[in-house]
C-alpha cells in the first residue's frame, strides 16, 4: 500500500528531510540539522512542524454537541465555541481507543483531531466527515513561537491557550488553535492545501527552525505527554495514565463511564504511569523491563535521550504503590541501570502548556 503524503511533501524534500512511514503517512523524521538540534531550537526559540498526518473529522449541524458529549470522555460543557479541549474516545472497558483534541469552531461545528492511524475508528463512532486531505496542519512551538507567528499573522499569534479562531493568510481563510505537543507555548494552524506551502515558507522566513517527528517525540517525552499506542491504548485507562482530569465525572453518561466508576470504587488502578530518570546518556527503550528488588514490576512504554537533561529518560507503568523518589532498575538490553521514579514532566513546561496534547 502506498503511503499518504502531506501537502508539504515538496517543501520537505527541498529541505533535505529524512522521510519515514508514520501511521501510513510519509512524514519528515528530521532535517539535516538533526533531531537534537531541532529539539533544542524548540526549547530555546521556535520550531515549525508538519503535523498534517493528524486527522480532522468535521462534525457539524444540529445535535453535534450531544453526539460528542455522549461518545467522548471529557465534558464539553467546560468550554464554549472558540475553545479546544483534550479528550479521549473510550471502549466499554474504559480503555483509550484514541486521544483527541476537539476544536469547537462555532455553535454547531466541531473539528475533531484524532491520531493518524485512528481516524477511521473515530469516524465510525462519532460520525462526521473526514476532511483530513483538505488541509495541512502546521505547528509552531517554542518560547519564541508567537513572536514568529506574529510576523506572518498578528491575528493568529493572538489566539489564547486552547483557544480556536480564524485568521486570514493572503486572502485564504485558515484556523488556528493555541495547542501543541511539546511542553512549550505555541499554535497549530489548519490551512487549505493550496496555501499550505506558502504558509510553511512564510513561517520559515520569519525565523522558525524546521523540525521533524523525531524531535516532536523527544519534546513530548521530556514534557511527560502520553503517546497513543505507548502510554495510551485500548487496554490502558485514563486513570492508569494519570489522566483522570480528562474524564467528565459530572456527565450523565458516556461510553466507558461504568468501567471507570468501578475502578474508582475499588480504590483506583493497580498500576500508574511514572517517569524514570537515569544518570546515564544511554536511553531506555520501549519494552525494557523495570525491576524492583530483582523482581519485574513493569516495563518502559517510551524512552529516549533527553537533549535538555543530557541523560536517558522514560515513561513506564509501575505498581500504584511505588512512591516517587524510589530507585528501581531498568534492564537496558541486558545491563541493569538505576533510575529514580519521578513525577513527569522531566522538563519544566511552559505555564500555558500544562494540558497540552498528544
Regions found by a protein language model. Give the residues of each.
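Acidic active-site catalytic centers that drive phospho-/nucleotidyl reactions
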Residues: 50, 99, 188
Amino acid at each position: 500500500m502506498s503511503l499518504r503524503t502531506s501537502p508539504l511533501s515538496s517543501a520537505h524534500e527541498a529541505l533535505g528531510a529524512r522521510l519515514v512511514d508514520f501511521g501510513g503517512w510519509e512524514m519528515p523524521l528530521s532535517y539535516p540539522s538533526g533531531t537534537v538540534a531541532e529539539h533544542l531550537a524548540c526549547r530555546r526559540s521556535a520550531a515549525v512542524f508538519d503535523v498534517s498526518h493528524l486527522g480532522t473529522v468535521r462534525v457539524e449541524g444540529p445535535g453535534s454537541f450531544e453526539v460528542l458529549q455522549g461518545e467522548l470522555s471529557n465534558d464539553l460543557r467546560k468550554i464554549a465555541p472558540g475553545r479546544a479541549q483534550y479528550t479521549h474516545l473510550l471502549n466499554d472497558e474504559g480503555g483509550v481507543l484514541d486521544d483527541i483534541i476537539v476544536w469547537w469552531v462555532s455553535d454547531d461545528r466541531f473539528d475533531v483531531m484524532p491520531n493518524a492511524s485512528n481516524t477511521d475508528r473515530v469516524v465510525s463512532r462519532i460520525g462526521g466527515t473526514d476532511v483530513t486531505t483538505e488541509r495541512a496542519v502546521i505547528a509552531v512551538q517554542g518560547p519564541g513561537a508567537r513572536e514568529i507567528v506574529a510576523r506572518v499573522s498578528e491575528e493568529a499569534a493572538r489566539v489564547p491557550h486552547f483557544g480556536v479562531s480564524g485568521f486570514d493568510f493572503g486572502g485564504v481563510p485558515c484556523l488556528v488553535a493555541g495547542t501543541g505537543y511539546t511542553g512549550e507555548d505555541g499554535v497549530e494552524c489548519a490551512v487549505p492545501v493550496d496555501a499550505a506551502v506558502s504558509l510553511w515558507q512564510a513561517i520559515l522566513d520569519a525565523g522558525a527552525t524546521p523540525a521533524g517527528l523525531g524531535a516532536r517525540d523527544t519534546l513530548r517525552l521530556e514534557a511527560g505527554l502520553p503517546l497513543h499506542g505507548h502510554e495510551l491504548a485500548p487496554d490502558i485507562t485514563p486513570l492508569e495514565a494519570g489522566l483522570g482530569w480528562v474524564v467528565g465525572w459530572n456527565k450523565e453518561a458516556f461510553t466507558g463511564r461504568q468501567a471507570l466508576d468501578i475502578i474508582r470504587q475499588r480504590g483506583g488502578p493497580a498500576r500508574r504511569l511514572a517517569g524514570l530518570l537515569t544518570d546515564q546518556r544511554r536511553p531506555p527503550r520501549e519494552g525494557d523491563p523495570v525491576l524492583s528488588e530483582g523482581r519485574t514490576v513493569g516495563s518502559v512504554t517510551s524512552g529516549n535521550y533527553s537533549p535538555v537533561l543530557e541523560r536517558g529518560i522514560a515513561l513506564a507503568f509501575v505498581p500504584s504503590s511505588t512512591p516517587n523518589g524510589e530507585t528501581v532498575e531498568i534492564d537496558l538490553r541486558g545491563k541493569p541501570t538505576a533510575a529514580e521514579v519521578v513525577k513527569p514532566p522531566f522538563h519544566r513546561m511552559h505555564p500555558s502548556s500544562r494540558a497540552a496534547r498528544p
